[in-house]
């Protein structure tokens, strides 16, 4: 699972 998803 991805905890942090940066919005580019």
Curated annotation (Swiss-Prot):
The keyword Secreted applies. GO terms for biological process: neuropeptide signaling pathway. It is found in: Secreted. The modification Leucine amide is found at residue 8. In larvae, expressed in the brain and ring gland but not in the midgut or the thoracic perisympathetic organs (tPSO) and abdominal perisympathetic organs (aPSO) (at protein level). In adults, expressed in the brain, corpora cardiaca, corpora allata and thoracic-abdominal ganglion (at protein level). It comes from the Eukaryota. One of its GO terms (cellular component) is extracellular region. Keywords: Amidation, Neuropeptide, Secreted. Belongs to the pyrokinin family. Mediates visceral muscle contractile activity (myotropic activity). This is HUG-Pyrokinin. It comes from Delia radicum.
């Amino acid at each position: 699972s991805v905890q942090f998803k940066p919005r580019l």
